[in-house]
């Protein structure tokens, strides 16, 4: 925003949570668009909110925002490889994401992007790089930039080959497993973990993530009853005992059973570890 000469204090409208644990309802999004839609150029939201794990309805948001003349983009860092994403059918104008979370490409790996086909040949402001130039004439080094049809035309330079290698293997695994099947297992895994936490760790942990499976992915964000210091102590204990989660300030532990390689036994092992910590 600053790069384009705008002051975020004046040009940015931030949605405020209207539900517990920082969750944002569709009603809140609709209210913001009704109030400000005529002066909003871009609606930019996550597919899944990184801290609390809330998943957003891409198609519903896009449809609503388009009625107000807004361009719509999504940050899918925590959604890609986690939820089935029908980006074209959602109508979103564009989306961006990384591959080092659920898609297992490792830190620093190349990112990904989607641009809806209705913008494929549009003359739009862009950072134009030689790798986005028409492949048939790319090496002629002509004076005019001729973009490749579609999202490839937004590429700047050639991708890092070594970081593509693990991504190629991972994407092949996802292709063979199938996102529909992975989502079905994910619903069962995270649902099982939720049930274990609620039935065996009541009074120790509280769940921040929406309880509706349609409003979340694999991730469960949890807080430890008793405050931040106890939460951090539990997180460190889990890490020391080989259970890898993630800590997000001020007081959230993120646990994400990944259906490609996590088992139901892993969910049970997490709960048993928390029990051991709570009673030691």
What are these regions (language model features)?
Residues 1-280:
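Pyridoxal 5′-phosphate
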């Amino acid at each position: 925003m600053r790069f384009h000469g705008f002051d975020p204090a004046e040009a940015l409208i931030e949605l405020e949570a209207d539900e517990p644990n920082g969750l944002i309802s569709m009603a809140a999004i609709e209210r913001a668009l009704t109030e400000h839609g005529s002066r909003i150029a871009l609606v930019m939201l996550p597919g899944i909110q990184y801290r609390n794990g809330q998943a957003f309805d891409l198609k519903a948001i896009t449809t609503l925002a388009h009625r107000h003349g807004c361009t719509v983009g999504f940050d899918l860092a925590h959604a890609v490889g986690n939820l089935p994403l029908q980006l074209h059918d959602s109508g979103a104008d564009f989306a961006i994401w990384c591959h080092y979370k659920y898609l297992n490409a490792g830190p620093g790996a190349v990112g990904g992007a989607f641009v809806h086909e209705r913008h494929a040949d549009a003359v739009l402001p862009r950072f134009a790089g030689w790798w986005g130039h028409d492949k048939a004439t790319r090496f002629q080094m002509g004076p005019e930039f001729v973009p490749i049809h579609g999202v490839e035309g937004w590429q700047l330079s050639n991708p890092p080959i070594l970081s593509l290698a693990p991504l190629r293997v991972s994407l092949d695994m996802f292709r063979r497993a199938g996102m529909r099947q992975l989502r079905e297992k994910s619903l069962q895994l995270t649902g099982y973990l939720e049930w274990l936490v609620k039935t065996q760790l009541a009074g120790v942990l509280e769940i921040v993530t929406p309880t509706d499976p349609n409003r979340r992915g694999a991730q469960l964000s949890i807080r430890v009853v008793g405050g931040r210091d106890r939460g951090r102590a539990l997180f460190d204990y889990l890490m020391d005992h080989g259970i890898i989660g993630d800590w997000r300030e001020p007081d959230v532990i993120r646990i994400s059973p990944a259906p490609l390689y996590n088992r139901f036994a892993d969910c049970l092992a997490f709960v048993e570890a928390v029990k051991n910590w709570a009673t030691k």
